[in-house]
């Protein structure tokens, strides 16, 4: 029984003494890895920043090209009176003189083509 205790104690002492020596090496390895990780993170951050700046430039360029005059003006729906000289009927509609109802109004209305 004493031999088992002595053997166990010997293994325990060796493990502790060698483990502390490795502890310093592990600490140095961890410092190197964190420094490498920081440089990698800085590189990835710069790359992401460049991509975001390019995307922002494209979006601002598209906004500057679009003006208020390029928007579609409001249109007149089906069955609504329109002006013969300036028809503002929606797409797919035509400004025509009414055939049956509305003859007495003497006005033009938007109808489907």
UniProtKB/Swiss-Prot annotation:
Molecular function in Gene Ontology: sodium channel inhibitor activity; toxin activity
The name this protein carries in UniProt is: U11-theraphotoxin-Hhn1a
May I have one GO cellular component term?
Answer: extracellular region
Keywords on this record? Disulfide bond, Ion channel impairing toxin, Knottin, Secreted, Signal, Toxin
Propeptide at 22-74
Organism lineage reads as: Eukaryota, Metazoa, Ecdysozoa, Arthropoda, Chelicerata
Organism the protein comes from: Cyriopagopus hainanus
- Please give the tissue specificity annotation from the record for this chain: Expressed by the venom gland.
List the Pfam families hit by this protein, alphabetically. Answer: Toxin_22 (PF08092)
General function of this protein: Probable ion channel inhibitor.
Signal peptide per UniProt: 1-21
The record's section on InterPro entries has: Toxin_22
């Amino acid at each position: 029984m004493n031999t088992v205790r002595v053997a166990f104690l010997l293994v325990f002492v060796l493990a502790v003494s060698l483990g502390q020596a490795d502890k310093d090496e592990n600490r140095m390895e961890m410092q190197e890895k964190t420094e490498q990780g920081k440089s990698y993170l800085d590189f990835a951050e710069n790359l992401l920043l460049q991509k975001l700046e390019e995307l922002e430039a494209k979006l601002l360029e598209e906004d500057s090209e679009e003006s208020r005059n390029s928007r579609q003006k409001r249109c007149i729906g089906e069955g609504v009176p329109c002006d013969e000289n300036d028809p503002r009927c929606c797409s797919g509609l035509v400004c025509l003189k009414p055939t049956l109802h509305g003859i007495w109004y003497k006005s033009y209305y938007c109808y489907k083509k």
